[in-house]
């Protein structure tokens, strides 16, 4: 197997001062304090949870990313934001538009123009759907983004609501991906947890399950048959849960679906980021096949270069996955999803 892997989900450590240089009037001279709302009140070092060496380094930029790709034998990465994971929590539509435009210009200038190994998803201001459609079009056609991120939390309506369907129609027309990315845990039932890792353990997969379930039952994948949507950084164990619960609702709860719940995961419509050491991965493949699953490094968040190599090797050395499954997970599926 080639060692040219694809990293389906890496992260930018945003430079707020640099992004400021791309902000248009009237917001450009308002300072950099509180650019982005907090992900939640859980992401704080005050709980005493230690961080591994080499993770969450704010100095990581395009050059460090290229070094990471070279050292891990990775063909390219697709970059998601860090503070921008809270983008759904932005309350002011005008600021959402201004920040999305500035962030996308920043990523285009600092990362995309630096190397084709650095791909990225755009931010789009879903607080104003017409502006989100226009920014998605600009990001993909003019700036070279592979698609855009959908917030996992914070929007005033569920991501499956028809209000957002013009965005899905435009993504389908552009033949670009969209992806829901976990990371914002507010109002998900974790407010009384006293240990942050417990919040993160459940706070990553549950918003993905909520988003995917809504998009299935509200008919998004039926209305837009060519739409590709990713669900990132929540692992794979939530997939059998969603399928089994929807099956029961179809059987006994009056839920009407055009297809069996499993079928939505089998036809290149839904893609899912995964880690190398997930025991649930083999069972998820047994249920829906290998096509949805994409290896994701999460660098430079909880993962260092050494951790990433360990997880790649864990995929390669697994005895419960076929050779063709490993090839799909480590590159083929991501290339198909991102169109690169």
Which ranges hold each PLM region?
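Mid-to-C-terminal alpha-helical segments outside catalytic/metal-binding sites
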Residues: 2-6, 15-76, 105-113, 134-138, ...
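Alpha-helical scaffold segments that form or flank carboxylate-/histidine-based iron centers
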Residues: 6-8, 94, 124-131, 156
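Short aromatic-enriched loop/helix-cap "lid" or pocket-rim segments at secondary-structure transitions
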Residues: 16-20, 90-91, 190-193, 241-245, ...
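Divalent metal-dependent hydrolysis catalytic cores, especially in the metallo-beta-lactamase
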Residues: 48-54, 66-90, 117-125, 146-150
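Active-site-proximal, glycine-rich beta->alpha crossover segments in alpha/beta enzymes
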Residues: 60, 81-102, 109-115, 125, ...
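Short glycine-enriched loops at secondary-structure junctions
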Residues: 82, 126, 182-187, 277, ...
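Charged helix-capping and loop-helix junction motifs
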Residues: 96-103, 160-166
């Amino acid at each position: 197997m080639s060692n040219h892997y694809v990293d389906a989900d890496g992260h930018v450590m945003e430079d707020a001062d640099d992004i400021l240089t791309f902000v248009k009037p009237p917001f450009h001279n308002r300072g950099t304090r509180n650019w982005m709302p907090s992900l939640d009140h859980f992401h704080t070092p005050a709980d005493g949870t230690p961080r591994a060496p080499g993770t969450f380094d704010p100095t990581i930029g395009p050059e460090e990313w290229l070094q990471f790709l070279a050292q891990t034998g990775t063909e390219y990465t697709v970059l998601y934001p860090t503070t921008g994971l809270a983008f759904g929590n932005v309350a002011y539509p005008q600021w959402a538009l201004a920040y999305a435009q500035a962030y996308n210009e920043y990523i285009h200038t600092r990362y995309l123009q630096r190397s084709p190994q650095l791909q990225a998803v755009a931010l789009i201001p879903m607080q104003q759907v017409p502006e989100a459609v226009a920014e998605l079009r600009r990001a993909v056609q003019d700036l070279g983004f592979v698609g855009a991120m959908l917030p996992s939390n914070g929007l005033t309506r569920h991501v499956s609501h028809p209000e957002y369907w013009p965005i899905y129609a435009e993504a389908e027309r552009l033949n670009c991906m969209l992806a829901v990315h976990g990371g914002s845990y507010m109002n998900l039932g974790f407010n009384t947890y006293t240990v942050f890792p417990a919040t993160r353990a459940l706070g990553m997969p549950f918003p993905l399950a909520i988003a995917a379930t809504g998009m299935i039952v509200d008919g998004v994948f039926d209305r837009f048959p060519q739409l590709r949507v990713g669900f990132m950084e929540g692992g794979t164990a939530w997939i059998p849960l969603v399928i089994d619960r929807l099956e029961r609702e179809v059987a006994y709860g009056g839920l009407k679906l055009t297809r069996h719940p499993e079928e939505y995961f089998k036809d290149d419509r839904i893609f899912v980021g995964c880690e190398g050491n997930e025991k649930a991965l083999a069972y998820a493949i047994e249920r829906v096949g290998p096509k949805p699953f994409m290896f994701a490094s999460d660098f430079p968040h909880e993962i260092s270069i050494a951790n990433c190599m360990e997880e790649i090797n864990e995929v390669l050395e697994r005895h419960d996955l076929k050779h063709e499954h490993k090839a799909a997970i480590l590159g083929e599926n991501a290339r198909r999803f991102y169109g690169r």
